[in-house]
């Protein structure tokens, strides 16, 4: 007799068992950052911030970065197929008093195009 093994019981929903998109991005960024910090420490480069190390990892040290909304306000649009670079934002305190670093989704100048003036 075959037994049907259900991974979820009736009180567990899909969202409780799989991380949200933001949780995935946070885990991904944390993993990259931890690796970069370990490599920087081993190389004696301890004065660099996480975001400076990420810029080096992305090979965009001197690039100009802005959010989608900021580029839009400047009259530019993100080119089709471009994906945002992940960076850590400034520390924020939630309504419950929890302090955390938000994720910033930034695009560099090479990823945008300014609208043509007619």
Identify the role of each PLM range.
Residues 2-118:
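N-terminal accessory/interface modules of nucleic-acid-binding and processing proteins
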């Amino acid at each position: 007799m075959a037994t049907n093994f259900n991974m979820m019981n009736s009180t567990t929903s899909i969202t409780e068992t799989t991380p949200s998109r933001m949780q995935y991005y946070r885990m991904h960024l944390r993993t990259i950052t931890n690796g970069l910090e370990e490599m920087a420490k081993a190389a004696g480069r301890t004065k660099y911030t996480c975001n400076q190390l990420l810029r080096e990892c992305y090979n965009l040290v001197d690039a100009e970065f802005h959010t989608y909304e900021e580029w839009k306000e400047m009259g530019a649009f993100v080119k089709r197929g471009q994906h945002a670079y992940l960076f850590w934002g400034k520390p924020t305190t939630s309504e419950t008093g929890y302090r955390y670093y938000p994720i910033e989704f930034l695009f560099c100048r090479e990823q945008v195009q300014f609208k043509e003036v007619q």
